[in-house]
Amino acid sequence: MDIAIQHPWFRRALGYPSRLFDQFFGEGLFDYDLFPYATSTVSPYYRYSLFRNFLDSSNSGMSEVRSDRDKFMVYLDVKHFSPEELNVKVAEDYVEIQGKHGERQDDHGYISREFHRRYRLPSNVDQSAITCTLSADGQLTICGPKSGGSESGRGDRSIPVTRDDKTNSTPSS
């Protein structure tokens, strides 16, 4: 029986996705985003920095879906978009969120952003009562109450995005 020997300096998990694919639209790049495996094979003493671990852990909750007995909720970080640049609608059994803004100047140059998200709604969500709120810190909250029936308020419709001046700390559970 052969046993594969793995060197300690090469134990870096190869499955970690790069921040290029995360939801940090235009937040800048780090060296390990462009060359993720070069630094782990060069030095046997290389370790992740504490700052990198913090960034990876802060990824959770960027888009969060909650469904309990009474309501269905979606939390989405859209801090780079204003309510006028967001379009939220219910189409068939999905809630769709689109955001788009033109070219703007930031610290790194010029950037334009666009995204499209779709979330399947449970069959007992009252689609006619779905609301959408954007908090002051850029957290979009979509809330739909659940009803006893299975076909309440079905159909395509646009949902207005209302602005809330309070910050939203609910998703970090």
From Swiss-Prot:
CDD domains: ACD_alphaA-crystallin_HspB4. Residues 153-167 have a biased composition (Basic and acidic residues). Its main location: cytoplasm. Residues 53-164 form the sHSP domain. It comes from the Eukaryota. Coiled coil: none annotated. Zn(2+) 1 binds at H101, E103. Keywords: Acetylation, Cytoplasm, Disulfide bond, Eye lens protein, Metal-binding, Nucleus, Zinc. One of its GO terms (molecular function) is structural constituent of eye lens. GO terms for cellular component: cytoplasm; nucleus. Heteropolymer composed of three CRYAA and one CRYAB subunits. Inter-subunit bridging via zinc ions enhances stability, which is crucial as there is no protein turn over in the lens. Zinc coordination is achieved at least by His-101, Glu-103 and His-108. His-101 and Glu-103 come from the same molecule within the oligomer, while His-108 residue is provided by another molecule. Can also form homodimers and homotetramers (dimers of dimers) which serve as the building blocks of homooligomers. Part of a complex required for lens intermediate filament formation composed of BFSP1, BFSP2 and CRYAA. Contributes to the transparency and refractive index of the lens. May act as a chaperone, preventing aggregation of various proteins under a wide range of stress conditions. This is Alpha-crystallin A chain. It comes from Psalidodon fasciatus (Banded astyanax). The lineage of its organism: Eukaryota, Metazoa, Chordata, Craniata, Vertebrata.
